[in-house]
Amino acid sequence: MSFLDRSFELHFNERPYLNHFSYLFITKTTRERSRSRSNFSILCRGNIIPKEVRDKDAVSRFLESVDQFERILNDSVFIRLERLTTDEIVGTPQQAGLIEKYFSLSQQDTTTLKDIQMSASEMRIGDDILCVHTLSDVDDLPGSVQTDTRYEKYSTDRSDCRLSFAAPVGLMLSCDHIYNQFLFIDDSAEILQRFEKTARNMHSLSKYSCANQLNKQWIDAYLDEAHSFGLTAIRCHCNVMAWSDSREKLKVIKNDTGSALALMGCKPRYNTIDAPALYWAGIPGGEGDFPSEESFFTFVEQGVCFFTEETNYADSLSPFGIKMADRTNGKPLHLDISDEPMRRGITTNRNKLVIGPSGSGKSFFMNHLVRQYWEQNTHIILIDIGNSYKGLCDLIHQRKNGEDGIYYTYSEKHPIAFNPFFTEDKVFDLEKKESIKTLIMSLWKRDTEVITRAEEVALSMAVNLFLEKIKEDNELVPSFNTFYEFVQGEFRGILEEKHYREKDFDLTNFLNVLAPYYRGGEYDYLLNSDEQLDLLNKRFVVFEIDEIKEHKILFPVVTVIIMEAFINKMRRLHGVRKMIVVEEAWKAIAREGMADYIKFLYKTVRKYFGEAVVVTQELDDIVSSPIIKDTIINNADCKILLDQRKYINKFDSVQSLLGLTDKEKGQILSINQANDPARKYKEVWIGLGGVQSAVYATETSVEEYLTYTTEETEKLEVTQMTEKLGGNMEQAIRVLAKEKKKKK
């Protein structure tokens, strides 16, 4: 585990969060049992097994129905059921089962036996005091219910963030609790017949009381609804069981639970009398013992509205991924946005498009992503403008004792320099030869000049002969200088032997045009680097091109070398993950006629276990280049958006261009709307193939923050402390992080 990985783990160590488990129990009961009241519970009787349970045909029909129900839900793709085994329900000597966990109010695999105490005023399980709120009467319910509702904290005037109707009593209720939802499927026809009989009785008694007439009207409305739309009549009950071992905390929990029910439009009802019976009926498989007087009549459609549909963010079931955090409770997450989505058929490639305005945390997120990819043995080439990756690259360079973390940048004192003719193994495959020819061609001919077939053949011959000489002559130092001298001397003689005419290949013109790159020329440093550096085996390489992006000579050369370096990795590193990240520099690359290369890259890199990532501030930049627009958007199945509030009024065009759904739009516009002030983080939306999307928190340790930061003052702090500690950047980050933690 690396220093930064360890600091991430320690940052989240022992952080409390609300965990969520969901169980669906389908219980077979009898007509008599379903009508029984709380005073007829099995707690009060000796014989607990009804005779219908011993009817093999009835049991067989029930199990067939359950199998069919399971198959229907699993086939829907949206939800998946996993059937519990007998050991998982009743437990084993080594591991607690679900029933044991229920009786101890714990999800731990090892549980302790706890006394259950019941009195008229409260119910205790061990040290915990139970607090039960119920929805068991129609009078306590709102006038209407719905499957989902608008969550104001994450909504804007232009977007909705939708949560399930019962979300306030699910994960939004931040205390230990169980939310039970009971749906009793009785004989619907029999229920409706009973209601019709009751309505007639009410009509007969209406002259004695207006209330009877009013009740008849309500019953008639229920019957009309059932018959008009063919609805199934059912009974329903919901309750929230919360607990605490402290009476003071229990008061707060009681108020919080009541407030959560009020948010649903329900009247909070605190239940003490029936708490034991409700707790008993909540035992897995014990729902048949539910007291019927605690239920109300409704229809299936309205009953399922009381289900909670949210759960904790799940870790990816993959060994590869990045570490993010749950936006609501700060739980650390393992997230795979490259391999797992492809395995599951959600995406068809690993390419990514990252969009975030200045100040949205775009560079910070990208630092976090590439650092973790690098630590998982990914080869990464970054093309940057603005020194966003300088801190991370320096740290890697120091950790690897200069063997990795290569940072190319241009300054007057230290101009950028390469050696395209050097490889550690002296292997020059077809791609390498073609890239050298392309490089020399770009130096020799302008874009407007046409190269003839004869010139192309001569240049190809010169390159191939020189590369052969490098392999044979161990004394020869490969560089542009020695190539120039080879062409000037040996190759001139070869051309004369082959009777090349000047009009076919003007050697003098060739040498004159390339003279500025030869020893003593204006750009003699560019292709004659003294560093024997082969980028093929360097896993983290940054090209910072801010100073040369407008340079007509240097920029095209650097661009060709960058592309050659990545293609070389693509072709030669088999079974190794490759990533190229093009920050704002892609605009300059496209302008220099490299749009076709990006197009090729996005369509081809998938076949070589690679991924291309383009990072931009505004979508308009991409739209302005038709080739880029069609290629990047259509071939980047992973789209990553940061805070878009600056563009909220024109987000419809972004939605249309990226093909986002209204749900995805709502998620994106909810970014950073209700961040927890106790945590330092920014949110990011990740969408995969138009199928799966969520908002995550980019929350890091102080050590990671100091490594990634692009704030000038903070970068300066790290630099000064590094110098003070004799150049040890890792130690400098540790010292500064310790100081900042003390100030909190």
Give names to the regions the model predicted.
Residues N13-L18, S228-A233, A325-R327, R343-I346, ...:
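Short glycine/proline-enriched loop/turn "hinge" motifs that connect secondary-structure elements
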Residues S338-S360, F364-R371, I380-L392, I406-H414, ...:
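Conserved P-loop NTPase motor cores
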Residues S22-F25, H379, R539, K578:
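The start of beta-strands in P-loop NTPase/AAA+ ATPase cores
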Residues G170, A277-L333, D339, K390, ...:
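P-loop NTPase motor domains
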Residues M1-V304, T308-E309:
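Extended, folded cores of ATP/NTP-driven motor/assembly subunits in large transport
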